[in-house]
Amino acid sequence: MCSSDLPMPHLRYNRVFFYDLPGPPLGSMTFIDAAEPMLPKRVGLLTTTQFRGWLPAIQAHLEKKGHVIRIGEPDRRVAYAGQLLGCDYHTATVVEGDVDGYLYIGTGDFHPLGVAILIDKPVIIADPERGTARDLKEVRDRVLRQRHAAIVRAQDARVFGIIVSKKIGQARMGMATDLKALAEKHGRQANLFLMDLVAPELLQGYRVDAWVNTACPRIAIEDILQYKQPILTPQEFEIVLGERTWNDYVFDEIRV
């Protein structure tokens, strides 16, 4: 077990404890070799905490094949180099200028999808469970089409519900009040909804034309089909109001 004296955002405690559990052993490089032909020369390595111990060996393996590897240092929201959270992509953005694409070590799209949307560079997933690799471009493009459709649907909305989380690490009341003021500047009505659990069934029955989510950034992405009204990220709300263009689209993050 290790502890950190650094305060984390929105936490009630100044001292946070991390239980450092060992990850699974790295048995084979088959899944890395499956990804290697899809990789550019300069690659940023990314993963979750489960596979973080594999990164040095994978880095050495790819460097022997001629790749230049970068592993981004963590910020105050993550503990390990190369680690991704669903709402924090610092270890990817900090090396963005030094790489031409990314290799994510893990299963599923949840963590690397945010990087693929945030940064216009290839993201390849190397899946150690299946022993396979794939490009995330098709999934990224599908999600961006969904986001564009949500923005278009919200263009004529007059009343917005701005969702604010009470959860530690997700509370962004300052952002929510700024967005409310921005809506009113453009002649729209906006009301704040302070919630512990954000779920579509808890938001039914309100006279709201569209939702703006300042809680976990992935709610608008992962749960979009569960909401009758369009649900936007803060940056998408700025596009609806004309404060930002689609060409300046960025993925929402919770950062220190």
Name every feature range the model reports, one short phrase each.
Residues F110-Q189, L197-G205:
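Redox- and metal-dependent alpha/beta enzyme cores, enriched for Fe-S-associated oxidoreductases
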